[in-house]
Amino acid sequence: MSFKKTIGLASALMLAGAGLAACGGDDAADGDNKRLVLYSSMTENDLDVLSGLLEDEFPGIKLEIVNGSAGELTARIQSEAGNPQGDMMWGGLDISTGDAYSDIFEHWLSEHEDTVYEEYKSPNGFFNVDHLSTVAFAVNTDLEEELGLDIQGYEDLLDPKLKGKITMADPTSSSSAWNNISNIMAVYGYGSDEAYDYIDSLLANDLVIASSSSIPFIGVADGEYVVGLTYEDGIASLLKSGADNVRLVYPEEGTSASAFATAVIKGGPNSDLAKDVISYIMSPEGQVAFAEEVGTVRMTTTEPYDSEFLPASDEVKWVDRDVDWLTENHDDVIDKWTELYTAHH
């Protein structure tokens, strides 16, 4: 019997419940060995998929999930460093953060590191890079048609008809929003006036800053927004679930992807189980199992997966992403974003 409870950062970890009670026959030590506290910024759908896969792979696992933005979660891990409460983090760990979290994660890589695409191997010895997140727009086709628009790229988002109808998460705390800002830099020029002028114009068109990374695609599907600046994984999950009022748009000016990772929290109460789980996530079997459930490609070179919900890579216009520049200039870009955002609010 497994136990899963997803809670927000404002809640205390609930380490007892019906699922644990149902496992009362286990002794305390065995129960502790099967309990995994996962900090994650992934979507509810992603977490549901992972939970199901782990229940099959690790019978009896007791999974506690603390869900929040990447910034919130890493701050929490740092604040708990003297008495770690979590075992691992999954999602939100963008490789462009470099060694910023070296002190809170155990320097450990799974045995499957050699199956990861060469350009996405761990940059720091503690990020196990398990998935790519490619920048894309979620577009509500019904609302797009009502407005008489054909949204294909960044410049289309500046149309006055879209004023207040575009959403993106907060790049000061959300890794998916930072991913989108990074792509704007890649398209318009890293640190260039043109890039910041575009961001300024987007804010002037009343860009709505969402409270979570899932709103820019779920809110579009629900008809709250016409466009969400988001990532292909979230949109693909909608398409796989049968959404027929959403289309996935890669900006015609070009798109790029950020690689995201999972890591073992240093000194966590059950780091051995965390390592076993990460090894499964990174394994060819785990990668393909997850890809088949969510409809997106993953990171393994051993068993490539072609998604029916995504175009072939050669059908997408790609731009180069300068990870080193983004790592070195992250704080400056966020400071400039904050300055521009404040000027419009």
Feature locations, PLM:
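Short beta-strand->loop
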Residues: 106-112, 126-128, 155, 244-256, ...
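Mature extracytoplasmic/periplasmic domains
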Residues: 255-256, 260, 265-321
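Early extracytoplasmic/lumenal segment of secretory-pathway proteins
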Residues: 24, 30-98
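Extracellular/periplasmic bilobal clamshell ligand-binding domains
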Residues: 308-345
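A ligand-binding cleft/hinge motif common to bilobed small-molecule-binding domains
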Residues: 95-100, 221, 225-245, 294
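Periplasmic-binding protein-like
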Residues: 133, 198-202, 209-210, 242-266
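Extracytoplasmic ligand-binding site segments that recognize negatively charged/polar headgroups
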Residues: 40-48, 71, 84-224
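C-terminal motif of bacterial Sec signal peptides marking the signal peptidase cleavage site
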Residues: 18-22
